[in-house]
Amino acid sequence: MNRLFLILLLIFSHEVFSQTSAEVLQSKLNAIQTMTANFSQIVKAKNREVSRSSGSMALQRPGRFRWQTKDPLEQLIVADGQKMWIYDVDLEQVTVKNQEKGLGGTAALFLSGYDETLTHDFDVSEKQKGKLTVFDLKSKSAKENFQRIKLIFSQSTLIGLELYDQLGQITDVKLVQIKSNPKLPAKLFQFNPPKGVDVVKQ
């Protein structure tokens, strides 16, 4: 789970047709400083459904995000730019990680908003699919967690992602009720472990 929300900071802006696909997508990322949305996701392996979940997310670039899964199991992931907390409610356990190590590789760069990430780590192409625009990112490294990422836009709004990992699993994410650049309270990206839970530092 904590590999997925990393990619959900990829958002929208206006298109400049003289730009390359990577530059167009990067401009979309740079246009978003804050974002909120509800999500639903399905993970498939060998054409079979492995898991299904839903919840809400928020991000503030650079480096802050909140990813809350509500169904089927409640989990909260909060990052403040330096540390990341993963709170598994049913286990009554909080795992604390260095944020960069917890995110890893390309995802951390996406979150931090480094402009060179797309062209450095991915080959990017785009195509029209009816009224939708699909950006297809193929990893240049076999070591990346996600070997392929598809970002699906309806006009200027990101409405879905497809993530292909090293194990052959496909994660299909749909976003709804998206708000771009809302004012977000700082406490949204702060976390204090509830009393009585186990805290594990990694």
UniProtKB/Swiss-Prot annotation:
<dbReference type="Pfam" id="PF03548">
    <property type="entry name" value="LolA"/>
</dbReference>
<keyword id="KW-0653">Protein transport</keyword>
<comment type="subunit">
    <text>Monomer.</text>
</comment>
<feature type="signal peptide">
    <location>
        <begin position="1"/>
        <end position="18"/>
    </location>
</feature>
<keyword id="KW-0813">Transport</keyword>
<dbReference type="InterPro" id="IPR018323">
    <property type="entry name" value="OM_lipoprot_carrier_LolA_Pbac"/>
</dbReference>
<dbReference type="GO" id="GO:0044874">
    <property type="term" value="P:lipoprotein localization to outer membrane"/>
</dbReference>
<dbReference type="InterPro" id="IPR029046">
    <property type="entry name" value="LolA/LolB/LppX"/>
</dbReference>
<keyword id="KW-0732">Signal</keyword>
<dbReference type="GO" id="GO:0042953">
    <property type="term" value="P:lipoprotein transport"/>
</dbReference>
<dbReference type="GO" id="GO:0030288">
    <property type="term" value="C:outer membrane-bounded periplasmic space"/>
</dbReference>
<dbReference type="InterPro" id="IPR004564">
    <property type="entry name" value="OM_lipoprot_carrier_LolA-like"/>
</dbReference>
<comment type="function">
    <text>Participates in the translocation of lipoproteins from the inner membrane to the outer membrane. Only forms a complex with a lipoprotein if the residue after the N-terminal Cys is not an aspartate (The Asp acts as a targeting signal to indicate that the lipoprotein should stay in the inner membrane).</text>
</comment>
<keyword id="KW-0143">Chaperone</keyword>
<keyword id="KW-0574">Periplasm</keyword>
<protein>
    <recommendedName>
        <fullName>Outer-membrane lipoprotein carrier protein</fullName>
    </recommendedName>
</protein>
<comment type="similarity">
    <text>Belongs to the LolA family.</text>
</comment>
